[in-house]
Amino acid sequence: MSRYAILGSTGNCGTALIENVLDSSMTEVHAFCRNQEKLERLVPRVISDARVKVFVGGIGDTETLAACLHGCNAVFLCITTNDNVPGCRVAQDTALGVVKVLERSRADGFLPMPKLVLLSSATIDDVLSRNTPWVLRSILLKSASHVYEDLRKTEILLRAEQDWLTTIFIKPGALSVDIQRGHALSLTDEDSPVSYLDLAAAMIEAVNDPQGRYDMRNVGVVNTHGRANFPSGTPLCIAVGLLSHFAPFLHPYLPSGTGPR
């Protein structure tokens, strides 16, 4: 039986991953989060489903993280933020924590290593974003500049470990809290907006590809049965993000949690 570790299991992507796994397979889920009550409120079925084991802690809690990753075939790195936080290190700290734990496992002889799946963004990829109007992409890059810089550094960090650790870099476009319509993976294109449920299904498909076609690749997600609804929180998120970019000293006074709805 397969086992997945989902880091950031209370976020939109994390909950969508749990829902997809529990709906479609007998795979076990190791859900890593800081607030178990929140997870149980968002995905009530985790309370009674024997396939789910919850690990409560922060990414710096090495022992809890090690227990969460133990025996897993795949690790989904979904700890992220929609707030353009100056000096953001969420993705880097997550990746560093995972690498540290897996290095110890490797030294102790626990092989093979799980495959990592990093949630990133098409906006920072020149190929996947080639059809995005220049003005729009420029606005998007600035509205999440601190988050995107964190993701760029995280990708460099993980690619530096590719001789022993495989990562898939999932880079969707705009995301929406919406129903699942159907998806396809692409190495050349993205489609916006995509629902979190379709994104999650795409991440699972990529990690399970028997030929490893997506290993160490930048992977886009396209819709196959129509786009998701426009995420209503996006305009405010962009506006607040731009303020954080041009006047980072204002960030503590700006609204938070303004991401997709």
From Swiss-Prot:
SUPFAM superfamilies: NAD(P)-binding Rossmann-fold domains (SSF51735). It comes from the Eukaryota. Keywords: Monooxygenase, Oxidoreductase. Induction: The cluster is expressed in rice fermentation medium. Three regulators are located in the cluster (ptaR1, ptaR2 and ptaR3), suggesting that the production of pestheic acid is controlled by a complex regulatory mechanism. Gene3D superfamilies: NAD(P)-binding Rossmann-like Domain (3.40.50.720). The keyword Oxidoreductase applies. Pathway: Secondary metabolite biosynthesis. Signal peptide: none annotated. Its EC number is 1.-.-.-. One of its GO terms (molecular function) is monooxygenase activity. Pfam families: NAD_binding_10. Oxidoreductase; part of the gene cluster that mediates the biosynthesis of pestheic acid, a diphenyl ether which is a biosynthetic precursor of the unique chloropupukeananes. The biosynthesis initiates from condensation of acetate and malonate units catalyzed by the non-reducing PKS ptaA. As the ptaA protein is TE/CLC domain-deficient, hydrolysis and Claisen cyclization of the polyketide could be catalyzed by ptaB containing a beta-lactamase domain. Belongs to the avfA family. This is Oxidoreductase ptaF. It comes from Pestalotiopsis fici (strain W106-1 / CGMCC3.15140). The lineage of its organism: Eukaryota, Fungi, Dikarya, Ascomycota, Pezizomycotina.
